[in-house]
Structure formats: structure tokens, C-alpha cells
Amino acid sequence: MCIRDRDNTHVVEPKYPGVVEQYINLGKCYDHNGMEGLRTAIISCMRGYKGHYQRAYRCLDAAAELMYDVRSTLDSDALEEKLSKRARGILDRELKPRKGAPAGTVKQRFLGAVTHRGQMCLWGTVECQCQRIYELSDRYGLAHRMLAHLLSGALKAGYDVVACPSPMAPDRLEHLLIPQLSLAFLSSSPAHPYPGKAYRRLLLDNAVSADLLRRSRPRLRFSQKITSALMDEAVDSLSQAKAMHDDLEALYHPYVNFELVDETALAIAAELSLL
């Protein structure tokens, strides 16, 4: 059983409406006559906040492309081997196989996000579950390779893990938590440093070929400068979108019958209790 909030930023269409899924029409809770005088203001706010969201997404997409370019610039077989070797050493030291245990399981959870308040990461959530923290100092977005090896090794050793994808590239790992061992691997960067005291700190940048890094430095500086500017623009657009969305809610709020909303919720709860 799942109840989904369907709005313009979370559009989910039913596959089998009427037999598996059904719509819940909260539009019936509006005072349509009272809202008629707000038509122009509502349309203006609706268009405005959508426009800010679209601009934010364009900036984030562009920033993600530049991040990919940085990673591609530094990628090499030698880098892969160095990170793989480092991961194997950690696995041998920290993740001893559990005798007789089945393979571990994976839960995926986002630990960070880009919001109207800026880039955020719930470091405190990690510290509530894990006391030993490996900080992967990662200026160029290289942590995924090491984390992928650690994830695979942890599962084979019989440990359950929480894999935390990057909000900028959800197909790439950014953090890895192993609560059974009170152990976490967190990637950090100058733009988003880990504020706590790490059990160990690994400098992933040192795995890059010094010659390649030297030759690529102007390109890397340019990409990171533009990426930072794009992220700032995205956050600014999200902030403006949030402000306009708040204005939109303020327009609607006096014309919503919240008693009817509550009645609808109670009716749904009664249906669920019969399942």
C-alpha cells in the first residue's frame, strides 16, 4: 500500500487506474467561487515558480556535465588499480567475512541534496549509526570507484549496507554506511567538507597521476569554477521558486476546506483498516 503526493515535481501516473491505483481528488476541497478573484495572481505565481525550477534544473544538469568532464579527464587504468588496491586493504582490515552468514543486503538512501538553502548533507544521521568514519577527501569526484569495491566486498562478507548515491549523479556512490560495524565511508570536498573528526582520512587525489594532474590543472580549475557558479545559480533559483511557492500556498490557504480534507483522510484510513 502506498499513498503518493502527485504534484508538478513528483508526477506519477497510475499503470492500472481503478483496479490497482486510484486518484484521490483533493480539488473538491477548494472554494472555487471564493478563488475566482485570484485567477490572475495564481496563474502568475504558478508560472513563476515553475520557471525558477526549470532554470535550477538546467543549471544542475550543466554542472553535472562538467563534473563528468572532470572525472573523465582524470580517469585511467592506473587510477582504477590504485583505488581498487586501497579498497582491498580496507576490506582485509575492517570487513572480516562473517562465517556462515548469507550475502548482505543493500538499502539505498540519499544522504545529501541540493536545496533552496544550498547543498546539504545529513552528517548527523551518519554519526548516530557509525562511530568509525573514513573520510575520503575527494576534490575531483573519484570516490565512487573505491566505494563500489567496498560495497561489493561488504556484501560478500555478509554485511548489510546503506548505499548513498550522489544527488548530482544518482548512478554513482557518494557515501557508504555499514551500521553493523559502526563503520562509514564518507566522501568530502573543499566545497562540502565533513565537519566531524574522522577515524581515518584518505586523500583520493593522490591516486591521480601527478603528470596528468599537472597537465590538466588549468582545465580542472576552469571546470570547477564554472561548476561552483552553476551550483550557486541553481540554489538561487530554488530559493526563488520556494518563495513563489510559499506565495502560492498563501493564496490558496484561505480557500481550502481543511475539515473536508480531514474527512477524506479519515475515509481513506477506514478503507485501509479493512485490508
Regions found by a protein language model. Give the residues of each.
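A glycine- and Lys/Arg-enriched "phosphate-lid" helix/loop adjacent to the NTP-binding pocket
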Residues: 18-61, 197-244
